[in-house]
Amino acid sequence: MSRLLLARHGQSVSNAVRRFQGVQDVALSELGARQAEALGQAISRLGIAAVYTSPLERARRTAEIAAAGLGLPLTSVHDLRELSLGDWEGRTVEEIRALPGDPYEQWVRDPVACLPPGAEPLPEVQARVVSAMANIAAAHPNGQQVLVVCHGGVISAYLAHCLGLPLSSIWRLTLSNCSITEVAPPSVRSVNSTRHLAGLAAGAPLSPSRLAL
């Protein structure tokens, strides 16, 4: 059975100001780069067999920094990209909250029913992510450890599948930038480990109080 180490990307420049990015290509902040270095130190002696990444820059750059000492190629997987947030992308949480009816609060409470205009439906996100993770796990049997660098929405959707949680509740999970979540499919071993980030700010936690993908 493979072990998937799911790492959320380091803090991006949009995370730092609570700006929705979705599938936009956004660079890491200086803090995000330092978080990626700390992630690299944490995995350096784990015998990582392969590294997979979302194609989006904030994840790809995190993977490049973290895996620099491993001597392994990065495999980009399109289905590991973050969920599209449609019309919200490029706007801040505060801007969305100021709209009539506070659609941000509605989305946090029920992201399945209260989808941002033009956004990717969560069931479709979960389907592609579960398929991608299954393919990665199947390629690395016999207990191999694999690093998968992706996004908060992606990891949350996958955890909901593994834990049997309704998609409407996925934002209750907390996932900090460059945290590690360990899954031995379908068993979840740990969620949001940040011990390797001691001394660094954890960045933007993916939680109901600070949710901005």
Model-derived regions: residue spans:
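Extreme N-terminal starter segment of soluble prokaryotic enzymes
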Residues: 1-5, 50
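Acidic, low-complexity terminal tails and accessory targeting/binding regions
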Residues: 2, 86-95, 138, 142-144, ...
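Phosphate-coordination/substrate-recognition cap region in phosphate-metabolizing enzymes
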Residues: 38-104, 212-213
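General small-molecule cofactor/ligand-binding pocket signal
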Residues: 5, 75-77, 189
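Generic beta-sheet signal
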Residues: 4, 144-153
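Short glycine/proline- and acidic residue-enriched helix-loop micro-motifs
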Residues: 103-124, 213
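Loop-to-helix element that buttresses phosphate recognition and phosphoryl-transfer chemistry
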Residues: 11-66, 115-130
